[in-house]
Amino acid sequence: MSRTPVTVRAAGACDVASLRELWSDILRRGGLDEQLADVGRIVTIAAGRDDQCVVVAEVDGEVAGAVYLEAGTFTPLNLEPAVLAVSPHVFPRFRRKGVGSALMEAACRFAEQHGIAHVQTAAAAESRDANRFMARLSFAPQAMLRAATTSSVRARLPKTRQAATPAASSKQRIDRVLAARRVRRGERVPG
């Protein structure tokens, strides 16, 4: 079985609509115009920086997939250099045609150009095919990234911790100051 040749290149402004469609499930929620503006900004910023790149894979001149690459560190606490390959996505009609491999090859090439020995990526936990693909490429699980809204986390925290918010602490400090003033004036302190 021969594969259709896959070419990779840096994304440009002409790719914004295709990238928005490809990454629609991971972009912030909003209208089409907002998402297009977000992707346009990402592509523009990456094009102007040496440590970032949006790579597009094409099959027969049509965008088949893309990945965002950024040279940085493993984590803010682990300063080992690493390239983060964010959201390597392939359109469903181009899967199993070498597009994903071409994107990850571009990530390795980007890492080598920056003298970086490690590439890291993430796949959605429920995406069995993506996780198997990454495992075949020798990516080992490192962490489980979780996300929640601030309000939902706060609702699940113990109420005793919530009482220590800055507003409550400020009220407690004011009560102490007023009590100290009463003591100095010789007034009786309630309680």
For the regions a protein language model found, what residue spans apply to each?
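Terminal substrate-recognition subdomain of acyl/acetyltransferases
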Residues: 2-3, 135-191
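A short beta-loop-alpha structural element at the N-terminal edge
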Residues: 6-21, 32
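Active-site rim helix/loop that mediates acceptor-substrate recognition in acyltransferases
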Residues: 32-54
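Conserved beta-strand in the GNAT
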Residues: 56, 62-71, 89
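Conserved acyl-donor/pantetheine-binding loop and adjacent beta-alpha core of acyl/acetyltransferases
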Residues: 68-82
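Conserved acetyl-CoA binding element of GNAT-fold acetyltransferases
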Residues: 79-92
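Conserved acetyl-CoA-binding loop-helix of GNAT-fold acetyltransferases
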Residues: 90, 96-109, 136
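Conserved GNAT acetyl-CoA-binding A-motif
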Residues: 111-123
